[in-house]
């Protein structure tokens, strides 16, 4: 398998679509004009020929999404357990066909569940309340971050949201280096998918992305915390608030959770010992 999209797939993965819409302004009469609308398509993750999950997502960076989802959902422990990926068109959307190691595939089949794909829904299809939440090993305390460098990251987060600038419809997730520089980022109509894309990219980048923190443009739900912890991320910054369950999970797994990140301020919910305040 390879990671190169065919021409046919590239033709359907434009990130926006122009549509004729009706615009209303208080001072004007209604008028019709073209405007940009964010693309949202069903994306099936198919492991060794068996469809495991269908999620609604932006049709871009799908191999990163597949890698991040596989890691954050505990399907694999290492990128080496995926031997290859292909993105191919299907009748109603796209498929990421994943060549998974035999050992991991057996484990996946043993706990396979059907997820009904809704935009960025992290618990869709969970059959019982007891299935919510995965056991996460407590994180080490090997990272620190100077909060004085957070403003730099926030200033450039929009650089990784070109579709949001056109449509106002996407979330972003970016990797913040200790200096505050953004090493890279991804956007998607679903906040969980954007984070999975980032986590997959981080795993594939290797040692260069070991140090630092994740920054998301959305709120921090418990799924965002859990996905980060499953991938070894020790610090999660969110532009918006955190939920009570997110705080509980972060406390339990030793993740430093920070919300309401704005220039010159932030709310630290858990494990502030990783943060340096200059």
Curated annotation (Swiss-Prot):
Residues the record lists as binding Mo-bis(molybdopterin guanine dinucleotide): 260-265
Compartment(s) of residence: Cytoplasm
InterPro entries assigned to the protein according to its UniProt record, in alphabetical order: Cytidine_deaminase-like, FdhD
GO BP terms: Mo-molybdopterin cofactor biosynthetic process
GO CC annotation, single: cytoplasm
Residues the record marks as active site: 121
Keyword DNA-binding: no
UniProt keyword annotation of Membrane present: no
A Pfam family: FdhD-NarQ
GO molecular function: sulfur carrier activity; sulfurtransferase activity
Record keywords: Cytoplasm, Molybdenum cofactor biosynthesis
Family of the protein in this entry: Belongs to the FdhD family.
Function recorded in the entry: Required for formate dehydrogenase (FDH) activity. Acts as a sulfur carrier protein that transfers sulfur from IscS to the molybdenum cofactor prior to its insertion into FDH.
Protein name: Sulfur carrier protein FdhD
Species this protein is from: Salmonella paratyphi A (strain AKU_12601)
Gene that this sequence comes from: fdhD
């Amino acid at each position: 398998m390879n990671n190169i999209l065919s021409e046919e797939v590239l033709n359907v993965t434009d990130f926006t679509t122009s549509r004729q819409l009706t615009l209303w302004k208080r001072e004007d009469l209604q008028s019709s004009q073209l405007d940009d609308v964010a693309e949202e398509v069903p994306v099936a993750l198919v492991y060794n020929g068996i469809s495991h999950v269908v999620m609604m997502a932006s049709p871009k960076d799908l191999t990163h999404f597949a890698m991040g989802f596989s890691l954050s959902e505990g399907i694999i422990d290492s990128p080496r357990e995926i031997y290859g990926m292909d993105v191919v068109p299907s009748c109603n959307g796209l498929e990421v066909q994943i060549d998974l190691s035999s050992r991991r595939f057996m484990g996946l089949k043993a706990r396979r569940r059907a997820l009904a794909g809704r935009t960025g829904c992290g618990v869709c299809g969970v059959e019982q309340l007891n299935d919510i939440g995965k056991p996460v090993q407590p994180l080490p305390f090997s990272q620190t971050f100077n909060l004085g460098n957070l403003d730099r990251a926030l200033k450039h987060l929009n650089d990784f949201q070109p579709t949001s600038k056109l449509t106002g419809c996407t979330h972003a997730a970016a990797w913040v280096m200790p200096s505050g520089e953004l090493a890279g980022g991804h956007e998607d109509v679903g906040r969980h998918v954007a984070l999975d894309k980032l986590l997959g990219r981080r795993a594939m980048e290797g040692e260069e992305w070991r140090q630092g923190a994740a920054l998301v443009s959305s709120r921090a739900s418990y799924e965002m915390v859990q996905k980060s912890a499953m991938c070894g991320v020790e610090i999660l910054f969110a532009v918006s608030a955190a939920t009570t369950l997110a705080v509980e999970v972060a406390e339990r797994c030793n993740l430093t959770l920070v919300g309401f990140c704005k220039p010159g301020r932030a709310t630290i919910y858990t494990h502030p010992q990783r943060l340096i305040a200059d």
